[in-house]
Amino acid sequence: MEVTRLGLGLAEIPRHDDSQSDVEAAGRILNAALDGGINFLDTSACYGETEEMMGKTVAHRRDEYFLATKCGHVTGGATGQAWSVETIEQSIDRSLKRLQTDHIDLVQLHSCPLEVLEQGDVIEALQRARDAGKTRFIGHSGDNEAARWAVESGHFDTLQTSYNLVEQHGHTKNLLSLAGEKEMGTIIKRPVANGVWGKTSSPYAYGDEYHRRSEIMRELGPIGDEPGDPYMLTMGFTLAHPNVDVAIVGSHNPAHVRSNIEMVENQLPIADSVVQEIYRRFEQLEDDWRQLT
């Protein structure tokens, strides 16, 4: 299956208490994405009840989407230690049950620390799951030194990492290019920088740093040919990188999903001069801006 460049991230799916209303709301969002042509769905064992919601609402459409989830943390009433082999194995088995599927397309380590990656046990656990047919591919989701190690190691099929107009280490440190050279799939989280470009504040706690960077970059003045829609600018910048395979965006409602699809299909790409100017500003102004995990 060739995945769409726009994917749906499940971190923002409504989930309060796994009530029927939450399940129905999640189903409307998920089905709107599939109906609109999105075929990449990304969730995690630690995203509340989203795996169960997916199983209840779109398991019957399983052949229509590439299913990615993550593991490593102790969640869902499980016992044990984070990043233990037992936790990894239990998490994958629990995800299969929740998602109501006999296989997952991609299982990713969720922000696994560098020292744990270097030990190798969790990677071997993923490899055994792949050999057993529980997952088709294995990946790492993370940033900074751990992300580079994951790419250079050659153990993983995919990398999920943060990349956007105020988070450009994937470009400046050649991480995305290196992943491309190794024929890894690249999945981008936070591709629209939490919507901070042009805003006076951020609704997300970890978006404060993004907002600060945005303000510094914008102080250099307007960008020629900059799209009037900040969302179009940010998504256009992210998808302009030649080594970005899919960008995952969350949503609270079906209308937002449909709007995202329409924008990506009909309003992109943005002018290359805009992309190059954003590169220039980041490289000129960054002050050891590390990736936010």
Located regions from the model:
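Structured C-terminal cap/extension of enzyme domains
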Residues: 29, 34, 39, 153-154, ...
